[in-house]
Amino acid sequence: MKLTCMMIVAVLFLTAWTFATADDSSNGLENLFSKAHHEMKNPEASKLNKRCIEQFDPCDMIRHTCCVGVCFLMACI
């Protein structure tokens, strides 16, 4: 009896946790699919196509856009 009650409480807790931490519970899959469709129609919008900055070129310390290494004193090293 105790084990059954503990299992029910655990399932309810995990269900509540899932809903509480969800990014967008309304139309989540619909938004995901429409975004993917937009990226297929416009490859420039894809996050995978973002270019990185080569070594010793000027960089932006906020966005971390260096290909290898880090941005230090406005240059990728």
From Swiss-Prot:
Disulfide bonds join 52-67, 59-71, 66-76. Residues 1-22 form the signal peptide. Residues 23-49 form a propeptide. InterPro entries: Conotoxin. The modification Methionine sulfoxide is found at residue 61. The keyword Ribosomal protein does not apply. GO terms for molecular function: ion channel inhibitor activity; toxin activity. It is found in: Secreted. GO terms for cellular component: extracellular region. This is Conotoxin King-Kong 1.
